[in-house]
Structure formats: C-alpha cells, structure tokens
Amino acid sequence: IIPKSQMNVRKSILEKESKHKEMMHKMSLSSAENNIFKKVVNPHEDVKTKDYWLMNGDCVERSKEIPDNHLDLVVFSPPFAELYVYSDKEADMGNVSNYEQFREHFSYLIPQIKRTLKHGRICAVHCMDLPIQKGKEGYIGLRDFSGMIKDMFLEENFIYHARTTLWKNPVTEMQRTKALGLLHKTIKKDSVMSRVGIPDYVLFFRNEGDNLTPIQHQDTNEREPNYLPVDLWQKYASPVWYDINYSRTLQYRSGRDGNDEKHICPLQLDTIERVIHLYSNEGETVGSFFGGIGSEGYQSVKMKRKSVSIELKESYFNLNKKNHKDASVENSVLSLF
C-alpha cells in the first residue's frame, strides 16, 4: 500500500525502470549487431602493394581468396607434423597430437594449391623425414614424412616431377639433437642402432595441363633475365645439393614468443633462390602458403617476382611484412643506379 503522497515517486520509479529496460534491450540489440558485424568483417590483416599480397590467418581459409590460376610457382616448407610447435593457435597445423592428424589437416590445403597454381607449373615443398621417439612410440626409427606428402599430392592428381636432397652435416645434427644413432658411443655399444644423418628434401610437383608461358633460360648475357650457364645448371641438376648455406636465412628470433616450445629455423635463402630461378620468369607471382617470416616472398621480390604470402602467427606476420618491405625498398634503391 502506497500513500497518495508517494504516488508521484512510485510513478517516477516505474518510468525509470521502463526506460532502463528499454535501454538495455537496445544495447542488447546493438551488441548482437556488432557481433554479427565482427563475424562478417575479416579480423585479419592484409597488406597489398604492387610487389606483394600478404595475408594474416589460416592458410586453408585465406587461400580461398586467391583467384584461380593466379600463381606461377608455389614454394613453401610446411609444419613438420608433431616435430615442432610453432604457435599456440588451434588452426596451426603444427599443433597436432599425431602424424595422421596432420595428414587430415594438410589434405584440406592441397586442393587450394592445385586451384591457384597455373597449369603445368611447379609446386616445390621443402621437408624432411621425421624421427620416431622411443618415449612416444616405444621404439626409435624414422617416419616417411616426405613419402606422405608425395602420396597426398598424387591423390590430388599432381605429377611427381622431381626430388632433390639437401646435404646436411651429420656432426651438426648430432650436436644439436643428441640423436642416439649419430653418437660415436653407439657404434661401440651396438652399431645396429647407428644411422646416417637426416637430410632435407625439396619435392617438386607439377600441376596438370600444359604450361602456356615457357620459362626460357639463356647463357650468353649474365645481365639479362634468366641467365643460367651450363656450370650452374649442372649444380641445379644434381640429385644432391651439396652447397646450400644453412646459415643464410632471414633473421627470425624477434618473431619467437613465450608460446614457442621448440627451435624453429626458416628455410634457407639459397634453396628458395635456386627454385625461383629455375621455375619462374621475372614479373611472375610466387606463392607461399606457410609464409612464416617471409623468406620465400622476400627472395621472390628481390628476384623481381611478385609474392603472395599467408601466415597465421601475428609475430611472424609482422616480420613477414618488414622483410617484404625491405626487399621492395632495396629493389627500388638498386633501380636508381
């Protein structure tokens, strides 16, 4: 029971409650609209210039934005299944619990590579076979990671074009990994457990169809594009590349953060340079679906190609941007002289 003298107070309170409910309803609607907008708007960063197109995000999703037959060459080094942890992101293919889980995730990307790569052109994949650890699986051995990648590309009707082996110093590998099979004490105890070092590979896959734009090299003028003399070609044609400088890489340390669990090393610039030289023309577009800190794109721009690079991890993507910009600026400076 409210006295007549308090009726106006009650009326005022009820009006304020009504206005408050109305305001909360409008705020709720506004919040819902904003959430919908956020879902529609791409939350990732893009950088587009005349020389490169950089995308931050999951390569499987972002690659769908690349037009059909847009790339003249694809070069990348995928996450090495469960061997390394590159970031703490759920979409990171390095964050898998086993080999088969990586295979499942990677299988979604290969159709996008096939769609975006021009007919008759090359996709070069850097990889290595993976050590099987006794603590995980109860025995020591090797997993045929390169063979798995080959089989997956063949399933998408790529042509297995070639493979080259990148020689690695087994002493360096032994010092870095302390692998039982490389230790000298192993041959004293039981040599059956000793093994050779694990090299890197570059697997070359050719897309179906005819290449409509030939890549024609010449050996008469080193100042002209596509200069490839016979002595250099003999190095390229070797099934083992002995002369790759493993220390010639882009700086990466500032791209690491507290969530990185293991050592990560970017792809050697020598390897990238050789692949780009052999399988693309100046002015063509080179794609990397695991852009990292931008090694493939940096070298592409330096060699007067265009780059399309996708990277998930923000700290790597920031370095990717910087390295692409540096390459573009260096080219501009050189063109002045």
Where are these regions (language model features)?
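Cysteine-dependent PTP/DSP-like catalytic domain, specifically the C-terminal lobe
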Residues: 315-337
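Core catalytic lobe of class I
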Residues: 14, 19-319
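Conserved RecA-like P-loop NTPase helicase motor core
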Residues: 1-9, 16
